[in-house]
């Protein structure tokens, strides 16, 4: 049995401690991945700073995004995954309160339906940027209590509807743009002007400056949706309150699915009759979307070049010891990139 090492979070408010961790063999529906690269997300420094989740016990291991090699396969895992496969995966340690399922260690147990085999021409570094952003975008777009859009495919039928992706250059946004297009929807997005080229390159038909004053942005959005049918709004980053105010006005001017879902904390003063929800990637394990995206769609989409890993990976160091440097940088804010740590 291999030895395992992890970046332990002893308690909130202190740095990681690099220590031994048990190597855990997989349950019947899981695989074990030897991690080559892990990526960092804002939730990582939030959970280092404070116990935001009452169900998460400390000491623990954090981290959600991994790319690596399958080294052990559970007895009921389908033939889709086998020993030696190069994969990306969404780690579930935070949601399950099981350190063996977290990313920030050498070996991670992952539910097989949240594992995607990656093509040989895709590096572990680039693959590692995808899992959490992809999962959050997928839940927001396709979950029945969210926008409830049709699932993506390699040859989508046009729906004649248009999604608004707010903050399209964010980790969730870049995935939402591509998933929306793959599901047959047109995508209008907001972003900083410096990221217009990025979001248009991913397929957005229009990019609008979210830093514009509210009146200007409302008029631009109204013009962008003139004659179009709204499929809903996925708000991926930024202040939800100001975005809700603009979208409430927009909903009065357009036709379609007037529903707003966000990844961030909702304000208390939401207008009456404003349909909304908050999305969490953790629901992907139980709603059928995980298998549809990670198992069925993503492997061929990556292989055929129909889905691009984004945002851009930026290596902050090598080894588990570099994770603390990464979360410290992430606290200061990053734009249109994903901080990653190579473990090999």
Describe the role of every protein-language-model region:
Residues 131-212:
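Mid-domain Rossmann-like dinucleotide-binding core that forms the NAD(H)/NADP(H) cofactor-binding site
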Residues 286-344:
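C-terminal hydrophobic helical "lid"/dimerization subdomain
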Residues 42-49:
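Cytochrome P450 core scaffold surrounding the K-helix E-X-X-R motif
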Residues 1-17, 25-26, 49-51, 55, ...:
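Eukaryotic N-terminal targeting leaders
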Residues 91-163, 302:
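NAD(P)H dinucleotide-binding glycine-rich loop of Rossmann-like/cofactor-binding domains
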Residues 157, 206-287:
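Glycine-rich cofactor phosphate-binding loops and adjacent beta1-alpha1 units
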Residues 22-39, 51-95, 101:
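Glycine-rich beta-strand-centered segment in the early N-terminal region that forms part
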């Amino acid at each position: 049995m291999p030895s395992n090492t992890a970046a332990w979070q002893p308690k909130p408010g202190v740095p990681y401690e690099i220590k031994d961790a048990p190597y855990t063999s997989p349950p019947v529906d899981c695989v074990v991945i030897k991690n080559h690269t892990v990526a960092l997300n804002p939730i990582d420094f939030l959970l280092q700073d404070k116990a935001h989740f009452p169900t998460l016990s400390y000491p623990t291991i954090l981290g959600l995004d991994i790319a690596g090699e399958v080294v052990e396969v559970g007895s009921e895992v389908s033939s889709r995954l086998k020993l030696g496969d190069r994969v990306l995966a969404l780690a579930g340690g935070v949601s399950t309160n099981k350190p063996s399922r977290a990313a920030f260690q050498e070996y991670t147990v992952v539910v097989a339906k949240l594992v995607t085999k990656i093509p040989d021409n895709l590096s572990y570094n680039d693959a590692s940027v995808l899992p959490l952003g992809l999962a959050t975008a997928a839940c927001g777009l396709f979950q029945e209590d969210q926008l409830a859009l049709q699932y993506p495919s390699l040859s989508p039928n046009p729906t004649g509807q248009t999604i608004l992706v707010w903050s399209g250059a964010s980790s969730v946004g870049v995935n939402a743009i591509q998933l929306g297009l793959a599901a047959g929807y047109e995508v209008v997005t907001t972003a900083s002007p410096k990221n217009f080229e990025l979001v248009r390159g991913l397929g957005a038909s229009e990019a609008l400056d979210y830093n514009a004053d509210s009146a200007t942005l409302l008029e631009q959005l109204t013009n962008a949706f003139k004659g179009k049918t709204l499929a809903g709004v996925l708000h991926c980053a930024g202040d939800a309150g100001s975005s809700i105010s603009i979208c409430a006005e927009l909903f009065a001017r357009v036709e379609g699915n007037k529903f707003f879902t966000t990844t961030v904390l909702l304000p208390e003063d939401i207008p009456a009759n404003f349909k909304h929800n908050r999305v969490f990637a953790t629901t992907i394990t139980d709603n059928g979307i995980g298998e549809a995206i990670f198992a069925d769609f993503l492997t061929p989409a990556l292989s055929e070049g129909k889905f691009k890993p984004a945002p851009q990976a930026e290596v902050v160091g090598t080894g588990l010891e570099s994770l603390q440097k990464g979360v410290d940088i992430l606290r200061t804010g990053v734009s249109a990139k994903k901080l990653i740590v190579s473990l090999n």
